[in-house]
């Protein structure tokens, strides 16, 4: 059979299921693909196919993630589902699967559980912008008051972590009944309601190419008679010949103008997000720019040295440390293209961090780095990755 061509006709949105173990995340994922395939196109993925999530590596960390796709009338959704709690923690912190929005699955029979809370907190920390709720297993709860109580608890939990709890769509249903084709209110119609909530409550994401220009510096060359060329992969935005840019990070910010854009030794008028490009900079010396800095649209990003982060520490089996670390730990933090030493401070009451833990920490870097909240980094010791983190709050 010929391979189906990827149709780019509908806008593309990345989502995923989060929530406590055994509350029905994978069953709901299967139901979304089944009903999506029947109504709007796409292909049904059965529970077992999703549950056997393949392992993949992100920033040196092995994560099991299932990727499925489904359609709504107006969008194409790429959806991630993880088998285990640890996979969620790793996935969200490394940004292996960026989510424009999440579907929080909570069992109506059990109500919010520890991982329900932890996944909401993680979503806040790593910058998942929107959450829609599916109260699953509604067929196991006969008491309408009990359902209302669980819904209230979930709304309070969302509000506690700065999500709009009162305005969040909460759909009652049974993923299992929907998979069986049940047409009652909590069966197939509940899944259609959920898809509608995704369409309306999760805004279309800004494409990388529409965001302000940013390119991490990978290499710097001096070309006699032409000047200095900086190479890297454009992370976001568009750069045109004649644009003014800033060089940010490590040292004082400098301004310059791009006088040439080249790709594969060809001169172009512009480069855009995703391109590996070389930019020729006016009046810039070879020694003015170094790996670890970024070129960006003036004023769009600032250098910082102190921030809060959410970090996952690799277990011994994953090639991480064999021993815990303590306050004052000074590893290398790898941002974009370079390592920078940072001092680690732990929250009050946390004495040490064990391999396999995830923890909130405060980091002070010895040199400033261009950063926004949501920037991912690796923690390294002597070139090997021992952890992964995400900037959750900039302090200074």
Curated annotation (Swiss-Prot):
Residues 174-176 are annotated as: G5. Residues 81-84 are annotated as: G3. Gene3D superfamilies: P-loop containing nucleotide triphosphate hydrolases (3.40.50.300), Translation factors (2.40.30.10). This is Elongation factor Tu. Disulfide bonds: none annotated. It comes from Xanthomonas oryzae pv. oryzae (strain KACC10331 / KXO85). Keywords: Cytoplasm, Elongation factor, GTP-binding, Hydrolase, Magnesium, Metal-binding, Nucleotide-binding, Protein biosynthesis. GTP binds at residues 19-26, 81-85, 136-139. Signal peptide: none annotated. The gene is tuf1. GTP hydrolase that promotes the GTP-dependent binding of aminoacyl-tRNA to the A-site of ribosomes during protein biosynthesis. Mg(2+) binds at residue 26. It catalyses: GTP + H2O = GDP + phosphate + H(+).
